[in-house]
Amino acid sequence: MEYHYLLNKRISFVKQAFIVGLSLFFFLPIKAYHIRGKVVDPTQKQTLIGANVVVKKDSTTILKTTQTDENGCFSIKDIAEPNISIAISYFGYKGITLHYYGNSSDIDMGTIHLLPETQQLKEVTVIGKRVIQKADKYVIIPSEEEINRVSASISLLNELKLKMPGLRINEALQTITIDGSAPVFMINGKKQPLSKVQGLNHQDILRIEYSNTPDLRHIDDGNGGVINFIMKTPVQGGFIMANTNQAITTMRNRSQLTGSYFKKKSEWSIQYNTTWRNSKKVYDNKNERFIGREYDIIRRQEGLPSTTKDFDNSVLLSYTYMYDPSTMLMASLDLKLHHKKDCEDNRIVEQYGSSVERYTKNYYTNSHYTSPSLDLFFKKALSKTQTIELNSVGRWSNGDYTRGMRNSNLYHQENNTHNNSWNMTHEVLYTQLFKTLSTKWGANYSHQVAENNYAENSGKRVTDKLFKDDIYLYGVVSGALKSLGYTVGLGGKMYRNATATRSKTFFRLKTTATFNYAMGRNWSLNYLFMYNPSQPSLANFSNVVQTIDRISVQMGNVNVKPSVWTRNRLLLLFNKNHISSSLQTSYSVTTNPLVNTYQYISDAASPYHGLFMKKTENGKNDRHFNVEYSVGMQNIAQHLSFQLITGWSRFSMEGSNYRHHVSKMYASISLNGYWKHWSAFANIDLAPQYSIWGTNLYSGTKYNYMGVKYHLKNWDFGLRLDNPLTKRGFIQCAENISNVVPSHSEYYISDMANMVELSIQYRLPFGKAYKKANRTLRNKNFDAGVNNEY
C-alpha cells in the first residue's frame, strides 16, 4: 500500500512538473530573430534590385515586408513567430516561398536564385538601375532613399521623372503631363482620379509602371500615357493622412483628409478633398478685329483688377472585398460639389471707321453643380493565364450656369443654363497570357443624355436635349521577337450623336503600335504609331444660338464629323548610372479638326443680320512637327538631381478660308537637392510650350517656383515661393488667327506673383501598409454637355 502511495505521489509530481514546463514553453516570450539573404538572377549573373520579400505567419497574416537593396541584399529584424513563410518575388520572374517551423534563431538564407518567367524572359530588358523596359511600358522600382526623400506620391514622381521619358510635373500646380497631355492614373491597374493618387501613402508604393504610349483601352480619354502605381502587399491596419497647403500672401487653400483600413478580406477607404481660391488681381488684356462690315471693328480691351472665386469639395467612399486571391469585388461612391464665380472688369476702346467708343465692361460667370457617381467592379481569375473583368459606372450631374455682361453704355446681356445630364458605361475585359505573348480583348458601351434649358435676359426658355451612344470593341497583343518588343492594338468604334429631331452615326477604326528595340544595356529605341478618330463633345452639337455680346453670337453644329489624329514618334533613350537622356522627334496630323469659325451674317432676312456668328466646324487639317531633347543627372554626390528639357515645334493650320504656319521654341530646367531630413527644389520655365486647337494657338503656363521641405517623423513641412521676382504672376497667352475675327489675349493673376505657400502634412499609420488587389477599372470621363466659356 505504501509502495503504491509513493508511486502515485511520484507520478503526480511528474505530471505537475510537465504541465508547469509546458506552460513556461508556451507563455514565456520567444526571442526575436533576424532574417537576411541575397536575391540574384543566375541566368544573367546579376543581383535583383527591388525584389519584394514578404514574411507571413499564415496565408492571410503578413508580419513584415521589405525590398532588396542596390546589392540585391535584404534584412528583416525582430521576427518573433516560430512558424513563418518567406515569399520572394520580382517583376518578370518566378517567385518562390520557403517555410520555417519552430524557429527561434537568426536565419541566413544565403543566395536565392529567381528564374525569369518563360513567357516574359524575352520581353524584359534592364536599361538602368531599378528600370526595366518591357514591350509596352517602363517598370521603375523606387529605392528606399528615393522614397524617404519625399513626402507624397506626386513628389516621388518628380524624383523619378528622369527615368520616365516625356513626363512633366509641376508640383506647385499639381499638374502631370506626358508629351503635353494628361495621363491615365491607375492604382494596381485600376483607373483612378488624380486626387486618389495624391492621397496615396507613398511609402507603400512598390513600383511604378509607366507608359508614354496611350493605351488603346483608354485612348478616347485624350491621354498621353499611363502611370500605374503598384502597391505593397496588404496587411491588417491602415493609415490616416491629413495635409493642407495654405498661401500666406493671398487667399488660396488646398487640403485633403484620407483614411484607409484593411482587415482580413476587406478594405474600407474614405477621402475628402477641398480647394478654395479667391483671387482679386486677375487681368485679361485682349485685342480683336471684326472683319466683314463696311469698316473693320477694332476692339482693344484693357484688363482691370478682377476677381475669381472657386470652391470645390469631393468625397470618395470605396469598399473592396477579396473573396479569395482570384476573386475580387469593388464598389465606390463619389460625390463632387463645385462652385465658381468670376467677375471680370475691363476698359474697352472700340473703333468703327472714324467713330470711337469708350466704355467699361463687366463680364461675369457663375457655375455650380452636384455630381454623384457609382462605380462597380468585379474581377475573376479563370486560371493562371486567364482573367475576366466586369465594370459598370454611372454618373449624374445637375447644375446651373450663368454668363452675363454689363457695359457702361447701358448694354446688358445675361444667359442662363440649367443642365441635367447622366451617363452609364459598361465594360467587359478578357485577358490571356501565352508562352511568348499576352492578349486582352474588350467591349465597351456608353450611353449619355444631356438636357440643357436656356434663357436669355429672363426671356422664354428653350430646351435642348442631346444624346450620345458609343460602342467600342478592341484587342491588344504584346510580345517580343528577340530584342524587339512590340504592342499592337486595333479597335472599332461606332458613334451615334443625336438631338431631339436628328441623329448621325459614324464608324471609325482605331489603332496603336509600339516597338521597343534594346540596343544593349544602356540604349533603347522606341517607335510609336497612333491612328485615333475622336468624337466632339456634346456641347459642340447644340444648334441653340446664344448671344456673346452686342455684335456676336455663337452656336454648335450637329453636322460636325469626328476628328482623326495620326501620330508618328521616334524616341532614343539612354540610361547609365546617374545619367538619363532622350532625343525624340514626332509628326502628327489632325484631319477634320474642330474649329470655331467666324462669319459675318450679311443676309438681311436672317434674324442675326449684321452680327458675327461663331460656329463649330471641321477644318481641313492641323500639322505639328516637334523635336525635343532631355538630359538629366540623379543623385549627384548623393545630394543633387537636375533635368534640362528643350524643344522646337512647328504648327501648320489649314481650313476652307485660312492657312497659317507658326514655329515656337520651349525650354525648362528643374533642380532637386536633399540633405538628411531637408530637401530643396526649383522649377524654371525658360520658355513655355505651345499647343493648337483649330485656329487657336495657346501658350503653356509659364509658372516658376522654388521651395524647401523638412521631414520629422510623421510630419512634413514645406515652404514654397511661386513666380518670384515678377509683378504679373503666371501668364497665359492665346492667339486666334481667324481671317474674320483675329485676336490676341494675355491672361494673368497678380495674386500669384511672389506668392508664399506653407504646406503641412501628418500621416498616422496603424498596423501595416496596405495594398488593393490588382484590377483594371475604367471610369470614363464625364461630358456634361454644357459650355459656359464662349
Predicted regions and their residues:
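Transmembrane beta-strands of outer-membrane beta-barrel pores
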Residues: 244-248, 263, 274-278, 335-341, ...
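N-terminal periplasmic accessory domains that precede
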Residues: 108-113, 123, 127, 153-159, ...
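Periplasmic plug
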Residues: 172-213
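Outer-membrane beta-barrel signature, preferentially recognizing the C-terminal barrel domain
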Residues: 523, 533-582, 589-591, 611-625, ...
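Short, acidic Ser/Thr/Gly-rich low-complexity loop/linker segments typical of extracellular
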Residues: 59-73
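Outer-membrane beta-barrel translocator/receptor signature
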Residues: 220-227, 235-284, 310-313
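Face-selective signature of the C-terminal outer-membrane beta-barrel domain
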Residues: 312-340, 363-502, 506-512, 516-522, ...
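Short, acidic, small-residue-rich periplasmic hinge/interaction motif at the N-terminus
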Residues: 40, 52-56, 89-93, 107-147, ...
